[in-house]
Amino acid sequence: MRQQFLYVNGQDIGALTLGLLSEAPLLETFTVGPEKFLESLDGFLTKHDLSVDTLDGALVITGPGSATALRGSLAIMNTLAFTSGLALFGHEKPKEQSDLVFIQSLDLSKLPAEQGELEPVYAHEPRITRTNRDALRRLKPNP
């Protein structure tokens, strides 16, 4: 029986790419934000008559990319792995490389399952700024 692997790429804040990995990979990109990633994954699995229990594993892109998007996609996949025992294969992918080219360059038989949770690789350091508002959310006067 042929193995079924899910492909999940949540590098981009405005899109989620999902796929089934086989001789001819099937890829679909959903133009949604992280708040719709789980809904998109559910719809994708339903459309292709799959469930997490029927999958042999998932190849998950860990970055680099948007911090918010990666936290969303990895939280979903880490939760599925924890609750269902789904094997996760974490891999970095250059953001400019197409998903199809990336998938075709891999040998799935040589990817070891990650131990524990997958962790994101961010595109840059966090950009934390000070607020210009007080505790009541009023603009502070300029000094």
Feature names for model-found ranges:
Residues 57-62, 68-86:
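DPxDG-like acidic metal-binding loop motif
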